[in-house]
């Protein structure tokens, strides 16, 4: 378990929550590697909750500046929940349902089938309310991460 901390980059656009949450995800993932002495190569997948395409790009750029390249290991549930080519979803899905559906569906199935042995699952969240959005207050992000590992053969 890697508990995250609230990260506020001062972003105020409630229509771009992925970018608001990405700095928290980057901080938590970076902290996880530091705390456990691991690197992206130690995991089959590094999964975030619902950053979408824009937030994913921010996450990857922030980690790259720290010398961390997630490469093809990164997956975002907000992107995976839709077929963006067929469904015109723009940035992808948003909300905790993305994490739940993708984790409990394809990810755990792939673990059961042995396609994924070890993954970081980093749930993302935005700290906001209707009132804070109406008042144009900054939207902070939070992210906590767990490692899921397949036991046995």
Where on the chain are the PLM-derived regions?
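Condensing-enzyme catalytic core mediating Claisen C-C bond formation in acyl metabolism
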Residues: 1-30, 35, 72-79, 88, ...
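Glycine-rich beta-alpha junction loops
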Residues: 2-7, 47-53, 125-126
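Conserved catalytic cysteine-centered active-site region
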Residues: 5, 65-102
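Electropositive phosphate-/nucleotide-binding environments in soluble metabolic enzymes
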Residues: 15, 19-26, 53, 97-101, ...
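A structural signal for small-residue-enriched, beta-sheet-centric alpha/beta enzyme cores
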Residues: 21, 37-40, 47-57
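Phosphate/pyrophosphate-binding loops at sites that engage ATP/ADP/AMP, CoA/4′-phosphopantetheine
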Residues: 28-42, 110-111
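Short glycine/threonine-rich loop-to-helix capping motif typified by GTGT followed
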Residues: 51-66, 131-138
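Internal helix-turn-beta structural module
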Residues: 99-100, 105-135
């Amino acid at each position: 378990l890697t508990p995250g901390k609230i990260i506020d980059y001062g972003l105020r656009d409630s229509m771009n929550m992925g970018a608001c949450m990405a700095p928290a995800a980057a901080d938590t993932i970076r902290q996880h590697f530091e705390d456990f002495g691991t690197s992206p190569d130690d995991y089959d997948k590094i999964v975030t909750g619902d950053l979408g395409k824009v937030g994913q790009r921010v996450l990857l750029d922030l980690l790259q500046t720290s010398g961390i390249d997630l490469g093809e290991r990164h997956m975002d549930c907000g992107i995976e929940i839709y077929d963006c080519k067929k469904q015109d979803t723009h940035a992808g899905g948003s909300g905790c349902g993305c994490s739940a559906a993708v984790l409990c569906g394809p990810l755990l199935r792939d673990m059961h089938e042995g396609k994924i042995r070890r993954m970081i699952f980093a749930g993302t969240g935005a700290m906001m309310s209707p009132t804070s959005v109406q008042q144009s207050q900054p939207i902070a992000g939070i992210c906590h991460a767990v490692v899921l590992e397949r036991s046995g053969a």
